[in-house]
């Protein structure tokens, strides 16, 4: 299609106004985001960079009205190049065009994408404009064909609490869950920043994993169902490599796990690399880092800690667009839910490790894969830690393996457990065979 058609979004999307308005009126999620006591109407818009003809949306308490027109008077405008909007408005969007957040960027910064106007309103209304853009795409090109969710009817996990003395944080009442065949190789799963172990229920109930491994997950201190440490001050959480690696080592020891495989995504993928570096200290047998790299080199914002932003709304919105648009909606909703339900400061404090607290540059090259095999996995829809970053890290580790996961994003274990297990099972089989060769 001629890109000139996307310079004027008023003309390109204007014919969908009636259809879009109908979807906005009927959408339960949007209603939940807008029936929140909004006192003053906010007008926002989206348009092609350098052009004022676009789409406008007036947001009030329980009411959203859409129209096409000049975006000059909008409080804020979501702007992108014509070719970027063209890719966004696709029934099969390529990464990172599944989300305006992906276009806005971190490690994939899209030149030409910017938010014009009042940034505070852009952040405050993040769940509203995100949902409206999703529905606008649906009105233009139809719904994205997502994969079906898993239909498990039996749960195999057993959960308990254990007191563990942790370096840095001290004595903590931690929650953990286990499933699988105790006679099979042990694997311990680590959740992402600002979330909890519920992320792995789909994986830990999957038949291919139940027959393959003895699986353990635990919630980090103050996350999910784990209690804060006895010294934790509300809002003061901060994570670093020594605290994180020390916690993993302490849990492995407390639960009597024998040379487990350590697997996690995002910050947990980063720490899996740290575990490989310090494998003897931790007692780990192998690692499967997901969505991981030797260093996260990007500018950090502090939106996740601002007292002017509703963290239970903003944090899940910020990470929502990191997932594949083809992942089952029910599973993506679970990711949103777990990120909405954590205590203030936990996500921000975990990012202290993700942003600069982890630095494997000049260190990952020294990982001895004959003693701790490494198999890295990264989903192609992740715009935070991209497959290219993970692959570059894997190439620096002698003997490491890397696989790009098609149709998965930043939260592979949660957003689409069945698809993820196809890759995870291969990784487990590989590292288990390599562990048999370890001295």
Language-model features: locations:
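Feature captures hydrophobic
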Residues: 1-155
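Conserved HGGG/HGGXW glycine-rich cap/lid loop of the alpha/beta-hydrolase fold
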Residues: 168, 172-228
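Active-site loop/oxyanion-hole signature of alpha/beta-hydrolase fold enzymes
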Residues: 216-261, 422
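Flexible "cap/lid" loop of the alpha/beta hydrolase fold
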Residues: 273-314
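Conserved alpha/beta-hydrolase catalytic His-Asp/Glu region
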Residues: 298-299, 312-368
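Short beta-strand/loop motif that positions the catalytic acidic residue
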Residues: 370, 376-378
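Acidic catalytic loop of the alpha/beta-hydrolase fold
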Residues: 380-385
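Catalytic active-site module of serine/aspartate enzymes centered on a nucleophile-bearing elbow/loop
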Residues: 400-439
């Amino acid at each position: 299609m001629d890109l000139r058609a996307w310079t004027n979004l008023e003309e390109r999307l204007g014919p969908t106004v009636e259809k879009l308005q109908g979807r906005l009126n009927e959408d339960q999620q949007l209603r939940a985001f807008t029936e929140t006591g909004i006192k003053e109407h906010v007008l926002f818009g989206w348009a092609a960079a350098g052009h004022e003809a676009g789409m406008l949306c007036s947001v009030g308490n329980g009411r959203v009205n859409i129209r096409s027109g000049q975006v000059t008077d909008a409080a804020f405008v979501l702007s992108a190049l014509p070719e970027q909007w063209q890719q966004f408005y696709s029934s099969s969007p390529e990464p990172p065009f599944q989300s305006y957040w992906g276009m806005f960027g971190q490690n994939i910064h899209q030149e030409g994408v910017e938010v014009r106007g009042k940034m505070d309103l852009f952040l405050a209304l993040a769940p509203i404009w995100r949902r409206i853009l999703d529905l606008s795409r649906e009105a233009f090109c139809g719904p994205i064909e997502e994969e079906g969710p898993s239909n498990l009817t039996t749960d195999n996990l057993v959960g308990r609490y254990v007191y563990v003395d942790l370096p840095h944080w001290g004595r903590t009442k931690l929650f953990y869950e286990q499933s699988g065949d105790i006679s099979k190789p042990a694997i311990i799963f680590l959740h992402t920043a600002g979330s909890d172990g519920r992320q792995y229920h789909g994986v830990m109930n999957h038949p291919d994993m139940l027959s393959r491994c003895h699986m353990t997950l635990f919630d980090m201190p103050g996350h999910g169902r784990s209690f804060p440490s006895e010294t934790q001050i509300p809002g003061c959480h901060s994570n670093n490599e020594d605290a994180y690696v020390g916690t993993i080592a302490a849990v492995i020891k407390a639960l009597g796990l024998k040379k487990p495989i350590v697997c996690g995504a995002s910050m947990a993928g980063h720490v899996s690399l740290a575990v490989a570096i310090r494998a003897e200290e931790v007692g780990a047998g192998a690692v499967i880092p997901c969505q991981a790299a030797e260093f996260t080199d990007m500018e950090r914002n502090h939106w996740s800690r601002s007292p002017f932003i509703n963290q239970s709304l903003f944090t899940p919105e910020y990470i929502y667009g990191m997932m594949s648009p083809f992942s089952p909606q029910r599973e993506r909703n679970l990711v949103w839910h777990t990120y909405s339900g954590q205590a203030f400061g936990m996500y921000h404090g975990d990012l202290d490790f993700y942003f600069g607290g982890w630095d494997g540059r000049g260190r990952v090259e020294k990982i001895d894969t004959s003693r701790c095999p490494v198999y890295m996995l990264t989903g192609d829809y992740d715009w935070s830690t991209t497959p290219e970053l993970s692959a570059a890290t894997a190439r620096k580790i002698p003997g490491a393996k890397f696989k790009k996961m098609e149709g998965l994003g930043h939260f592979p274990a949660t957003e689409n457990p069945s698809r993820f297990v196809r890759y995870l099972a291969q990784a487990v089989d590989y590292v288990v065979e390599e562990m048999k060769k370890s001295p």
